[in-house]
């Protein structure tokens, strides 16, 4: 078992980005993460829960996602507990807080100068002005790049924080499959009661990200996997941008009422743009007019900015320009109680299976790290 943690960069000694390398069985990796959660982050798992629901959820994950179930066993052992005790929920950590505001574009290899595929991605979140306060509810004070080499599934690199689900928000695996989440503000507007606010049987909104990284090598495999699993929303509906090394891509969304799965296919010869506005509702004039009438910036605004910027590009495109286009939708606004910021900009290279991550890019581009995931010698889980 190998479990190493190293600080990459920090902002004002209050917002930290660290790198973890974890190698071993899924259970041992889970144990290492669990020890970090309890010792460094004081994540409390004593919340009152419905033990019958937890038992049903554990049974589902044991049968449908055994890799995560093994990590959960490690989580539980770090807390001195067992998965046979259904009075605790070790399917995820932390709290279910408000959603992120995000923008991402996938550029397939056919339209880039070096024939590499790229995802350029902004992760935006509100920073409370009292974020330096120990009691401030800002979940991204400690964020991790988790480079993971489990014995029984694909190696991967993912971004996560314990205080917000403790599950991957995005990542890339050794086969070049990349998965990015974006909060789905539109479905939330229509159905504010969609969230369960507690664990249910199936996959919550973030668990599919690591699931696909663990088990899938292509976009086609990822789509088939998503069609087969049960979904529910603890806090916020999300949609997923998924792309592979071969240039295939799609966006996984929900229907307007949140009940059906929708798959929007990308094109191997053109960029695939996605923000917090659902692609399957771009033709919904009622919805677009409602978003246009809002006085605050929203996902539809950012989608149109990206569209305008990309329309001006003469392809093939360079990696530098790919990164620069996303600067046009960086968020940097000050409000009375909080600061709206692009917390991270990430550039995923689906050809080299690597990622560049920059902390607070609107403030300091030098706070950046580069990570590359190794393939196993036989190229299989």
Question: Which residues make up each language-model segment?
Answer:
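Short N-terminal edge-element motif at the start of the domain
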Residues: 209-221, 230-231
């Amino acid at each position: 078992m190998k479990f190493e943690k190293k600080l990459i960069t920090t902002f004002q000694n209050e917002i930290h980005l660290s790198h973890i390398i974890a190698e071993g069985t899924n259970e041992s990796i889970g144990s290492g993460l669990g020890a970090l959660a309890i010792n460094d982050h004081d994540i409390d798992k004593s919340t009152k829960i419905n033990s019958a629901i937890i038992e049903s959820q554990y049974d589902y994950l044991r049968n449908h996602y055994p890799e995560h179930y093994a990590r959960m066993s490690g989580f539980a052992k770090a807390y001195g507990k067992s998965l046979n005790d259904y009075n605790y929920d070790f399917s995820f950590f932390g709290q279910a807080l408000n959603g992120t505001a995000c923008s991402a574009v996938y550029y397939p290899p056919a339209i880039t100068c070096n024939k590499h595929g790229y995802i350029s991605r902004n992760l935006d979140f509100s920073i409370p002005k009292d974020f330096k306060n120990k009691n401030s509810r800002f979940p991204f004070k400690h964020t991790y790049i988790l480079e993971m080499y489990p014995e029984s599934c694909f190696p991967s690199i993912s971004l996560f924080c314990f205080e917000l689900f403790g599950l991957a928000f995005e990542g890339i695996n050794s086969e070049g499959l990349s998965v990015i989440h974006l909060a789905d503000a539109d479905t939330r507007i229509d159905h504010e009661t969609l969230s369960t606010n507690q664990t249910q049987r199936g996959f919550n909104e973030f668990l599919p990200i690591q699931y696909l990284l663990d088990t899938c090598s292509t976009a086609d495999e990822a789509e088939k996997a998503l069609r087969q699993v049960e979904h529910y929303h603890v806090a916020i509906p999300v949609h997923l941008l998924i792309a592979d090394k071969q240039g295939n891509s799609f966006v996984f969304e929900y229907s307007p009422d949140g009940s059906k799965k929708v798959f929007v296919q990308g094109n191997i010869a053109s960029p695939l743009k996605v923000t917090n506005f659902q692609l399957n509702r771009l033709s919904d004039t009622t919805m677009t007019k409602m978003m246009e009438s809002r006085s605050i910036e929203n996902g539809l605004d950012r989608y149109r900015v990206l569209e305008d910027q990309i329309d001006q590009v003469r392809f093939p495109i360079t990696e530098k320009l790919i990164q620069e286009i996303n600067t046009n939708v960086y968020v940097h606004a000050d409000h009375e109680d909080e600061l709206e910021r692009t917390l991270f900009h990430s550039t995923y290279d689906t050809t080299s299976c690597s990622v560049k991550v920059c902390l607070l890019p609107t403030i300091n581009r030098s706070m950046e790290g580069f990570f590359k995931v190794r393939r196993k010698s036989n190229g299989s889980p």
